[in-house]
Amino acid sequence: MNAIVFKNVKKQLGDFVLDIPHLEIKKGYITGFVGENGAGKTTTIKLLLGMLLPDSGKIEIDGVDVTTHGAEIKKKIGYVGDPTGYPAESKLKDIKRMYAPFYETWDESLFESYTKRFSLKLEAKYGQLSTGQKKQFALVMALAHKPSLIILDEPTSGLDPVVRQEILDVLMEHMQDEEVSVFYSTHITSDIEKAGDYLVYIKNGKIQINQPLNELLENYCIVSGPKNLFTQEIKKELLGYRESKFGVEGLVKSRALAEEIFGREVKYAASSIEDIMVFLSNKGGER
C-alpha cells in the first residue's frame, strides 16, 4: 500500500513546470524530500494539500483522489510548515479548542502528553512562543488528530540542535505507536539521515531519485584522483563531477562499478545526502 501516488502529474507556474509521470511514497515510512531551492518541493506539497490543482494527471493519498475528495483528504493529513499561521493573540488552549472539533479522530490525551513533553504552557499566547516552541506546538496539533499522513515542510529550519532532536524523537516515537507515513521536506539533510527510510530527490521539476535511504548511502560513492584518469568516456559514467587544480572528484552509483573502472588508482569515500545533491546539481565544472 502506498501513502502517496502521483500519476502523470504536470503543473506549470510561469516558466516552471513540475512533471512527475510516476511517484510512489511507501506507507508507514519516513520519506525525505530534498532538492535545491526552486526545484519543485513547495509546488509538490501544495498539490498534496489541495492548495494547487494539477494541470493534468492524478494524485492519491491512501488511495483517495486529492482533487475530488479534498475535505476527506484534509482530515487524513497533519501538516507542519514554515511559518505556521495560528493567531498571535490566541492562547494555545483556545487554538486547540478551535481546531479539535474538526477532527473526529482528535485524541485529547495525546495532545496533553505531547504538550507536556515539550513543556508548552497552554495559557501562553501563540505570539509569545519562540520559533522552536511554535514548531513544537504545530507538531503537537498535527499529531493529535492521528492523521495517516504527516507532511513536514522545513519543520526544524532555524532551530538549535537540541530542539531539532526533540522534534525528531517525538516524531519517531509517534510512528512506533501509530500507523502513519511521513513526507519530510527539508534542506537539513542530516535530519533525514537520522530519521529517514526513503529519499526522494527532485531537480528542475523532475524526480531524479526515489529509493531506500540505506541502499542509497551504501552504494553511492565518491571517487577522487588525478585528471588524467578521468577521460571523457569515464566522465560519462559519473553522476556528477568537480574539477580543480588538484584533480577530479566524482559521484558514482555503485562502488563495485567504480572499482571495475579505477581499481586502486583512486580514493574512495562514502557519500552523504548532501554530497549526492551537490554532485547531481553539478554535472561537470571547476571549483
Model-derived features with residue positions:
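Conserved beta-strand
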Residues: 6-9, 16-26, 57
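Walker A (P-loop) phosphate-binding loop of ABC-type ATPase nucleotide-binding domains
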Residues: 36-40
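Helix-to-loop junction immediately C-terminal to a conserved catalytic motif
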Residues: 49
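Conserved ABC transporter NBD signature motif
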Residues: 57-68, 72-73
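ABC-family P-loop ATPase nucleotide-binding domains
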Residues: 75, 81-137
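Catalytic Walker B motif of ABC-type/P-loop ATPase nucleotide-binding domains
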Residues: 150-154
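ABC transporter nucleotide-binding domain
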Residues: 168-252
